[in-house]
């Protein structure tokens, strides 16, 4: 958990499995009133989400925020594009790093910080299948080593 991070509402575990995360940054989200109520109720899905830089703005797509139950006519479309709030220099840096390099922007986590919904955005490079298998193999080896060390220390 990063310093000053609030209540975690949603995580994208699939992103850490499918991508190698190179860099992360925090972004604000532009939401309507009923959307923020749904986010606070943890009714958000980041699984297929991604972000794009267009015309000097960063847009979040394919993130599902369920309609708020008491929202009736004020509810928005669940998978609409949402603007992310970043500094101009951050946007320019992201645009340079994602243009033509095989890098993409994936949402990693949504949390509430000081009453505002924040998104942890990751600059990521896609993993190949053999990279995923290698990661799983390394993780299992570390677990086996930890298990053996625990057994030795208990004697």
From Swiss-Prot:
Keywords: Cytoplasm, RNA-binding. Its main location: cytoplasm. GO terms for molecular function: RNA binding. GO terms for cellular component: cytosol. GO terms for biological process: trans-translation. It holds the Pfam family SmpB. It is found in: Cytoplasm. It comes from the Bacteria. InterPro entries: SmpB (IPR023620), SsrA-bd_prot (IPR000037), SsrA-bd_prot_CS (IPR020081). HAMAP family: SmpB. Required for rescue of stalled ribosomes mediated by trans-translation. Binds to transfer-messenger RNA (tmRNA), required for stable association of tmRNA with ribosomes. tmRNA and SmpB together mimic tRNA shape, replacing the anticodon stem-loop with SmpB. tmRNA is encoded by the ssrA gene; the 2 termini fold to resemble tRNA(Ala) and it encodes a 'tag peptide', a short internal open reading frame. During trans-translation Ala-aminoacylated tmRNA acts like a tRNA, entering the A-site of stalled ribosomes, displacing the stalled mRNA. Belongs to the SmpB family. This is SsrA-binding protein. It comes from Streptococcus pneumoniae (strain P1031). The gene is smpB.
């Amino acid at each position: 958990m990063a310093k000053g991070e609030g209540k975690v509402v949603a995580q994208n575990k699939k992103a850490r499995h499918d991508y190698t995360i190179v860099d992360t940054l925090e972004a604000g989200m532009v939401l309507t009133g009923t959307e923020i109520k749904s986010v606070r109720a943890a009714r958000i899905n980041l699984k297929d989400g991604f972000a794009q830089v267009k015309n000097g703005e960063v847009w979040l797509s394919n993130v599902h925020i369920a309609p708020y139950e008491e929202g009736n006519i004020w509810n928005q479309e669940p998978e609409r594009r949402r603007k992310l709030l970043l500094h101009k220099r951050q946007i320019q840096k992201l645009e340079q790093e994602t243009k033509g390099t095989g890098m993409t922007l994936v949402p990693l986590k949504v949390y509430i910080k000081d009453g505002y919904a924040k998104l942890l955005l990751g600059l990521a490079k896609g993993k190949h299948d053999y990279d995923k298998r290698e990661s799983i193999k390394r993780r299992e080896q570390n677990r086996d080593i930890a298990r053996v060390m625990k057994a030795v220390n208990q004697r």
